[in-house]
């Protein structure tokens, strides 16, 4: 079955979307933030304000097909327009830190060695799952939110407590 955006339209391979929480009152869309002593915003976080959409992301899969389904491994890349210069050569990947694996940016050449994500139906929306090393669905783990000491709502590999998401076209008017 095809993946759908918030308008009920089919999610397009290479399309640009805001990734927003499905439930109201749980923060805004996904964006990038500096945490700790970082000089560049490398962490994928949920915007603190519920009305903030976050940063647009391109959702794509290497097979050149138009329509995305839950069967495909996906790449989710934040748009490079207006990104700080320190991020231009970075891609997204989970990285082990403390209790959870945070979703952080790393150099693109390192990213190829890590697993991919899939979008899975979850309640009436979707959840993003991380499949280490591109392994089978049984070993895929949910991506959820963990609040750190600085009140950042970090996206982490947190099996069993997923962030329910929906996708809003970045170019949508109104």
From Swiss-Prot:
It holds the Pfam family Kunitz_legume. Disulfide bonds join 40-86, 131-140. SUPFAM superfamilies: STI-like. The keyword Methyltransferase does not apply. The record marks 64-65 as: Reactive bond for trypsin. InterPro entries: Kunitz_inhibitor_STI-like_sf, Prot_inh_Kunz-lg. Heterodimer of an alpha and a beta chain linked by a disulfide bond. This is Trypsin inhibitor. It comes from Enterolobium contortisiliquum.
